[in-house]
Amino acid sequence: MKIVMENIHKSFGSNNVLEGVDFSLEPGEIHALMGENGAGKSTLMNILTGLFPSNQGSITIDGVKTQYKDSKESEQAGIAFIRQELNILPQMTVLENLFIGKEMTNSFGFLREKVMKEKAEEVFSRLDFSIPFDKEAGECSVGEQQLIEIAKALMLDAKIIIMDEPTAALTDREIDKLFEIMKELTQQGVALVYISHRMEEIFAICDRITVMRDGISVKTSWIKDTNYNEIVKQMVGRELDERYPERTPTFGKPVLQVNNFSRKGYFNDIKFSVREGEILGVSGLMGAGRTEIMRAIFGIDEVDQGEILLDGKKLTIKDPTDAMKAGLAFITENRKDEGLVLDFSIRENIGLSNLNSFSNKGFIKGKDEKDFVELMIKRLQIKTQTQELPVGNLSGGNQQKVVIAKWVGTSPRVLIMDEPTRGIDVGAKREIYQLMNELTERGLAIIMISSDLPEVLGMSDRIMVIHEGEISGELVREEATQEKIMTYATGGNGHE
């Protein structure tokens, strides 16, 4: 299928979202679509797949002008859209999720479960992925859920697959396998739209790139004819001096110390510390135990043994409330499920963790809350006209700032950040990095879990690498390289 979208306009009320966008897709190509959150990428793809119509412009598919009535019609035509927000029903099994709305039945209306399993196994084998079909999808990791979504698209036998941040929660091995599958699909004539903020992936896998900014298509280029700095300038409309802001940290005394921390089946004998003003990067492959260690420190999960000291005093943490009272804060990797209530306003979300500060004998002091939220909005440069705006209406970068504001407001001594810039555009990432620098300059200690190796190297003062639930290596900023981190992450000796 060949697609040509010309002069696409879309507005919602008085808000012009797309203003004359051009985009094309050739059979067998991988075309990257990049832009800051809010640039209009998803809106453009929603118009292509029939979620809503354009106000102006044309879509031509294989030479025929086309406008799908809905996403079901576009799916039947061979267009699959794997969205960033996973379409997984947690209470249903893996098999049920794969076939929801597309169940295979016999002439009596009974499910042909054996045939369904065979088809699912065929797709899973292509993904080199194994998981029990009767397992509840909600029990799967985020990475496993992403692969289920990809499997659903492959089962449609689609001619065009749109992928929105498909690798965000995948391990390096899973990403490599996905890229193999993508190349195999293009050889069969399938065209792929690849929406991502990961520049290294785009240069590794894509043929062309279209950059969008503020509802317009800035430029379409062949990957071989462009570079990182050019794309960043097109995305943000300005030069970014450096990808990561300069750090000139001043370290104080150890704030948090963890000793002999163990939980059977998850991690063993974890021992580390983090100092005032320091960013401790935590690296490792997916499933190594990085998040599990931090969840246990914050009191979400129990441990078998170990001790936690804050400012030299032993803590007893039985649940997150104890952790918060002690001076810990935890920004989880899944901000939309665990960090935010999307239907609530910015004010309500930021206030959730700070109710004690605004209440008097059970009554919330509204003015104090509003003043505090306004301060956080200005301090973190959250782009909004009102603090009453539902958080779900914000871009990914601004949603992440709301999560940070929510926890910074508790005045923590230690801030744990799990994948702090996942799914955030390059401009918003730099703002988050600058904020992290400001927080450490005030003496806050930050523990940053990240699967983005350039981010780990660019922002960490010290790097702790986890392999199979144990600390396999530790590196200071000056000696750290991607190769050394990956050696430790895969169980090797960094000194070999």
From Swiss-Prot:
Binding positions (ATP): G35, E36, N37, G38, A39, G40, K41, S42
Enzyme class of the recorded protein, top EC level: translocase
Subcellular location: Cell membrane
Protein's recorded name: Ribose import ATP-binding protein RbsA
The encoding gene: rbsA
SUPFAM superfamilies: P-loop containing nucleoside triphosphate hydrolases
One Pfam assignment: ABC_tran
Entry's EC annotation: 7.5.2.7
SMART domains, A to Z: AAA
PROSITE patterns registered for this protein in UniProt: ABC_TRANSPORTER_1, ABC_TRANSPORTER_2, RBSA
Residue ranges the record marks as coiled coil: none
Keywords: ATP-binding, Cell membrane, Membrane, Nucleotide-binding, Repeat, Sugar transport, Translocase, Transport
